[in-house]
Amino acid sequence: MSAEIDPITLAVLAGRMEQIADEMDAILFRAAFNPIIAEAHDASHGLYHATSGDTLVQGKSGLPIFVGVMSFAVKAVIDKAAENGDLKDGDIYIFNDAHLGGTHLSDMRLVRPYFRDGKLFCYLASVGHWHDVGGAVPGNYNPEATDAFQEAFVLPPVRLAREGVIQSDIIDIVMRNTRLPQSAQGDLNGQLGALDLGVKRMDELLGEYGAETVHAALDALQDRADALMRAELQELPDGRWEATDYLDNDGITDEPLPIAVALEIRGDTMTLDFEGTAPRCAGPVNIALPTAVATAYVAIKHIFPNLPANSGVMRPINVMIPEGSLLSAPFPAPVGGYTETILRMIDVIFSAAAGAAPDRVVANAYGTINALSISGKRENGQPWVMFSFYGGGHGGSVESDGLNHGNAPISTATIPPMEILEAAYPVMFKQWALRPDSAGAGMHRGGMGATYEIEVLEGGGAKAFLFGERGRHAPRGVVDGQSAALNVFSYEQEDGWHHPPMASKMVGIKLKQGQSVRLDTPGGGGYGAPSERVPEAVARDVAAGFISAEQATKDYGPAWQEIRT
């Protein structure tokens, strides 16, 4: 039976447990070898329920998508441990199977049971995006993959450590299946260090407060999140609202793929029904069921940002994913481009939610992470792989214009500075600037997209791979706001500049020394009718170079021309 816990102790324990996860984040960010973790912070840590795997606490610095999806990863380990029948203190499981743990194969998950007085108390988990985990394409974003095996090597949940003893044969297998073993070993050591720190901090916490009190706090925090979510829903009108948006293509067949949602509120519950979404496709924009459910959680957290980050928030939310759709693709369907699909899921949820709560949602953000990988060999023969994400504009809201040049709504990750990338790889950023006329018009316009131009300084058989979206279907506005500009990718060859046939996806374009690639990323959609934007704001945007005079007059009329800036 759980102990009673007073509100002050509950608040203190909540803060202490969040701090544990935050410290685990911080130690990995400092220890990781690859900039995707060290600079972009594509990683996460948390505490998870001993029997259900539900998220209890997650660090604030990790990616939001991991809040929901890591509970599925822990559940996969719980199932595997039950199958083995001998879970012990000091065991650590490792795996990257996206159909069990969500997201994609680049995300390596470590799960460690935490025991207190010989009894399982909870799980600690670490996930980080490794630089390369094999597969056909360096960096693992393969737009032409038709199964998981073409994306990366697939590791099911296996024990990396048994009762505290690292199994070197498992490490040997993992390191043999990456192009960058030094980077992978550094990331693995960082994740192991984060788990060690988590165990140490949990020992300190339970030594101070006792296991019964901390357990009661964890239960109470989930119950509180449930109650807060229900209270928020009761403030909204009952009803049903629908939205549909599209992916450009699946990288194999150049046909649009619809993602549809019906959002229904009844009292203190919400249903998100994705009936009408495209069936499983040949290419890698499928996602596994855990990823789809976790994405719904991320969207809900954006709409209700003050709610706690634990599984209790999702108790009043019913997520209905059609069997056979690209949102519930079974193994071995390719899921490497999951980021593009979940961003479209968030867009349609926001668009539908605008009918129920227009003051709580934002217009569509730029809607693609633009995963660009450039790889080659240095003059000394050593291989190099530069992999990074490239930002764009966020949507306008009832309160303000959208954020200029931010990262994706699934992410709190940062975009690595060009100086870091130029120091690490033989490239030069010839341009990194805000993109004029990229934002959707509105009472509050969207944020600005960006322009990146990257030159290869050492040829060595360099190749570029792009996995993006929004090349054919622009980010939309809400509440009568307008759409933003499209995503545009181009690459340089001897006869000039070219665009890929699939618009937003490209595989293995050869680049000689001195040749460049260029990304013009979308802005965010506008919020509210452009006619409601004050002329002074339009004039300021023209003066700042955010919008051309011609576009300003087209979108907002001539009144801004009478304003002196």
Q: What residue ranges belong to the model's regions?
A:
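Glycine/proline-enriched, intrinsically flexible loops and inter-domain linkers
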Residues: M1-D91, D97-R116, L120-T565
